Amino acid sequence: MPNPQPSARVPRFSPLLREVGSCCLLTAALLLLFSCSKPEDFQKSLQGKLINAKSGDVIDLPEGKFHLDRTLSLTVNGVTIRGKGMDKTILSFAGQKTGAQGMLIKANDFVIEDVAIEDTAGDALTIQDASNITVRRVRVEWTRGPNSANGPYGIYPVSCKNLLVEDSVARGAADAGIYVGQSENVVLRRNHVEFNVDGFEIENTENVDAYENVSTHNTGGMGVFNLPNLPRQGGRHIRVYNNQLVDNNTPNFAPKSLGPIYYLPTGTGMYIMAIRDVEVFNNKIQNNNTVNIYIINYHTGVDEESLRDTAASPITQQVFAPDDKRYDPFVRDVYLHDNDISGGGQSPDNRVDGVKMLAAALGGKLPDILYDGVVDPGWGHKRPNPGQLCLSKNAAASFLNFDAAGGMHHPVRDVKRYECSLPALSAVAIPQAAAGGK
């Protein structure tokens, strides 16, 4: 019999495979469009997606560096913006023409992850009046390094509730790399901040857990404080633990127009001002040249040089001339324990009058932990520790209460007066931090 001829069969794909193939082609086309289109086309497309988004939408951004010249804004709840990685999807605002922020978010249930925001004219990522916010693996940076012309804030949530900022990076901010203000229920974890004026700022905020962060090579590592004349007062219940606040000795590059941050002494590890219920434990706080930890009331923090500059800008006028009767300027109920503190105060910043005067009185160096000793007159000065500052097991950290109210006439170096404990503060619980949280 003759050999049978090969069958001329045509391959067939199932409807499902055809759908998958079409989807892949569409995705590839979109990626090509994002990657190869003109910068203005990418910007227009992305802003259009943000304007037309619906709750539940995920806006995927491709790998690449994309140039934008105006603020991106979102006001729709329940949206996720997701890139391919903080060093792979880069939104560059170098040469920004319109708007101050890189991104301005006024929406609840918002997630942004795996994206970089670079070289904005003002703040990089601003989030306002929002609840249930997640910022994950986001890098904000001014790529020219420390410069007074950089934007003030990197990651900048204000008036938020249930906020998680994790695994993110901030570099080059002329005020704070990661700031949280007038907010409630906040977790800051595993972030890295460097070469900012202030690494972290926790301002007028209640219920915060800040842990496993690294703050290094900033002017100051972390500030925890309340300021007057802001809508929300009474920030408290702050836990700072398992962090590294080390080598924060970058010269202060904030412009005077930004107000108080201009006076932050170079070489400040952590400062705690005008706030209560703060627990600081299991941290490494080392080699900050002015002081490792500075605990002060508001009026000590605002030195004479600052007061002379109240007319410099509306910011300084508001902060340095407070008339807020709701405001409590005193610090109390602060518990520092089980920290590794050493090497602070070796080369204090003489640019700031108050630091210069204090260092001169102490022979040119400052202790690791510096406390002004100022308390509310109503607390009873006959008690040995009316402000309830408690210190315990902080390695061999040196200490001084420099008696600011008494003109430094009765300083106290003996830390034993402050060896006590306070009840541990409870953990901050927010839904999005539950996985892998502490």
Predicted regions and their residues:
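Right-handed parallel beta-helix
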Residues: 62, 84-87, 108-119, 131-144, ...
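Extracellular beta-strand/beta-solenoid scaffold signature
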Residues: 46-47, 69, 93-103, 119-126, ...
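Right-handed parallel beta-helix/beta-spiral solenoid domain characteristic of secreted/periplasmic
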Residues: 37-44, 58, 78-122, 144
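Acidic, glycine- and Ser/Thr-rich low-complexity intrinsically disordered tracts
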Residues: 301-438
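Glycine-rich repeat segments that build the extracellular carbohydrate-interaction surface of secreted
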Residues: 49-68, 79-84
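C-terminal motif of bacterial Sec signal peptides marking the signal peptidase cleavage site
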Residues: 33-35
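Cysteine-centered motifs
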Residues: 23-24
